[in-house]
Every structure is written in C-alpha cells, then in structure tokens.
C-alpha cells in the first residue's frame, strides 16, 4: 500500500486513486457510502449509516482526508465524485482504472475493497485489539449485540487506532515490488 500511496497517476485517473485513498483514511468506508456523504460535522467527524448493514458509524476526518476532500468538494454531497455521472458508472470506472494504475502484481488485481481489507490487516499487524478493529469497520460485537446496547464504545480508541494505521503507512518509505 505504501508504494500505491506514493504513486503518481495521470490526472484523469487521480479521482479513482483518491477515492481509494479516502476509503483507507476513513477506516475502509465502502464506495457507496463515500459517494453518499453529505458533510463533515462541526466536531470534525462524518456520520453515516452503512448501506450494507444500516449501522451508524462516526469517523474522525484526519487532515490527510481533508486534503483529498477539498479537491473534490461537492455542492449537494460532500464529494463531487458522482455529481456528473451515476454511482454505478463511477463504481465501474473505479474498478477498471484501479487495476491499471500500477500494472505489475499484486497491484494489477487491485479493487476498491482492498482499502478496507488493508486497513484491518495493518491494524491487526500493529496489535490493535480485534474489538477496536471490528468497531472501526462497523461490525457488531463478536460477543453479544444485546450487550452492545448497554455499553457505549469509546470512539477515541478507534480514532487513535486509525491515526496509528495512517502514520504507519504514510510515514515510512514505500516498498518496492519484488
């Protein structure tokens, strides 16, 4: 991911790479949810109901994400990624273009979903607790969803985990393909 992060791409493909980067920075947000965001709240967070599960997520928007968001600031939506096209067309083009940005393996099989998978994998490699990773991804507790009603999860744990993951990827030298 480090190599992919530091890759320059043609301007026509930049929005697809930036959508992928935003997904990673926003804890693996799915493309349908990313394209439906409306605003960043005054507390510096985005709140959204995950399309797949309906669960409410709260994500702190880190400065690196703000930089990308500002490039694509929309009128009716937070991002203008789909304001001139349909979501399905953007999703299809994103899937096509991501595979061509770096032609050698494993990048030539890259999908948008890799951002979510990589966020979780990097988190686990950094010994971030499984419960924090699951909460960051919007998964229900592995223990008991009824218990979750009584326990308020401390979002600061996920915020700190996300910052640690971002720093791990962005502040180290990119790896070369072998």
Predicted regions and their residues:
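Short, basic (Lys/Arg/His-rich) helix/loop patches that form interaction surfaces
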Residues: 5-13, 92-139, 143
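Active-site/catalytic core of tyrosine-dependent DNA strand-transfer enzymes
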Residues: 1-2, 62-107
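Short, contiguous acidic/charged loop-to-helix segments that flank catalytic cores in large enzymes
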Residues: 8-11, 47-58, 79-86, 106-114, ...
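Conserved tyrosine-mediated DNA breakage-rejoining catalytic core shared by Y-recombinases
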Residues: 35-70
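Acidic, low-complexity interaction regions
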Residues: 85-92, 96-98, 125, 130, ...
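Catalytic-site neighborhood detector that most strongly recognizes the C-terminal catalytic loop/helix
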Residues: 50-54, 137-167
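Short, polar N-cap/turn motifs at the start of nucleic acid-interacting alpha helices
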Residues: 39-45, 109, 128-149, 171-178
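Basic, Lys/Arg- and aromatic-enriched nucleic-acid-binding interface segment
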Residues: 1-31, 35
């Amino acid at each position: 991911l480090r190599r992919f992060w530091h890759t320059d791409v043609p301007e026509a493909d930049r929005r697809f790479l930036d959508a992928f980067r935003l997904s990673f920075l926003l804890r693996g947000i799915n493309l349908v949810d990313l394209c439906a965001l409306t605003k960043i709240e005054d507390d510096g967070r985005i709140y959204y109901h995950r399309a797949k599960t309906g669960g409410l997520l709260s994500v702190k928007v880190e400065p690196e994400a703000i930089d990308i968001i500002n490039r694509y600031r929309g009128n009716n939506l937070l991002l203008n990624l789909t304001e001139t096209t349909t979501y399905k067309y953007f999703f299809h083009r994103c899937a096509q273009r991501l595979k061509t940005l770096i032609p050698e393996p494993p990048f030539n099989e890259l999908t948008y979903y890799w951002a979510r998978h990589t966020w979780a994998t990097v988190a686990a490699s950094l010994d971030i607790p499984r419960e924090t990773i699951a909460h960051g991804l919007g998964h229900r507790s592995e223990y008991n969803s009824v218990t979750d009603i009584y326990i308020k999860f401390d979002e600061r744990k996920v915020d700190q985990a996300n910052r640690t993951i971002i720093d791990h990827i962005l502040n180290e030298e990119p790896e070369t393909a072998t």
